[in-house]
């Protein structure tokens, strides 16, 4: 899922990637993240649009290696997503993947594997509950491809820092 020229493309990347235990949370670049958070409505109506700038920015942050920051933005989008909606399930999976990626950076492969496994459960839930085509995040996202990638990662004997997942690139493969 590449980022089109839009508001999301104009949002700056944080000045640094926050990593728990390496930097104090007060040192996270909250000023930059606030710009994206301000784009998230209090509630999305029926679905989260696949092209919503905060969603795209959260995905781009993950793919650029800003895992903690990605999780923060995606959690804000998740909180505004319709209750019980399919987007909440996919967003939860993406949040767990960003968290797993962060754990890999922190050299905690077992925790990363657990988060990848939890994300896979969410993706399997989506696969069982197919819906009609639309303009929502779920309909535009290749969940089956992402699930296959997670299964391959989890089948490895051990995960390393190099095993992090760029879920935005899944749609472009």
Segments from the language model and where they lie:
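N-terminal alpha-helical interaction modules that lie
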Residues: 1-82, 125-172
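Residue signature of alpha-solenoid helical repeat architecture, marking inter-repeat boundaries
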Residues: 48, 88-90
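Structural register within alpha-helical repeat arrays
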Residues: 57, 92, 97-99
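Short, solvent-exposed positions on alpha-helices
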Residues: 68, 88, 110-114
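Generic structural signal for well-ordered, non-membrane alpha-helices
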Residues: 68-75, 95-98, 117-121
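Solvent-exposed loop and edge beta-strand segments that line ligand/cofactor-binding
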Residues: 83-87
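TPR/TPR-like (Sel1-like) alpha-helical repeat modules
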Residues: 107-128
């Amino acid at each position: 899922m590449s980022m089109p020229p839009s508001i999301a493309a104009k949002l700056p990347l944080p000045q640094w990637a926050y990593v728990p235990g390496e930097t104090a949370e007060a040192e996270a670049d909250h000023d930059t993240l606030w710009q994206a958070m301000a784009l998230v409505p209090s509630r999305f109506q029926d679905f989260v649009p696949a092209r919503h700038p905060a969603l795209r920015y959260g995905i781009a942050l993950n793919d650029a290696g800003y895992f903690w920051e990605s999780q923060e933005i995606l959690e804000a989008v998740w909180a505004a997503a319709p209750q019980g909606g399919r987007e909440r399930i996919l967003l939860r999976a993406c949040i767990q993947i960003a968290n797993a990626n962060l754990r890999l950076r922190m050299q905690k492969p077992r925790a990363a594997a657990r988060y990848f496994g939890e994300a896979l459960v969410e993706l399997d839930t989506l696969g069982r509950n197919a819906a009609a085509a639309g303009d929502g995040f779920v309909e535009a996202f290749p969940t089956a491809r992402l699930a296959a990638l997670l299964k391959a990662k989890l089948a490895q004997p051990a995960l390393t820092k190099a095993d992090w997942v760029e879920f935005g690139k899944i749609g472009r493969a």
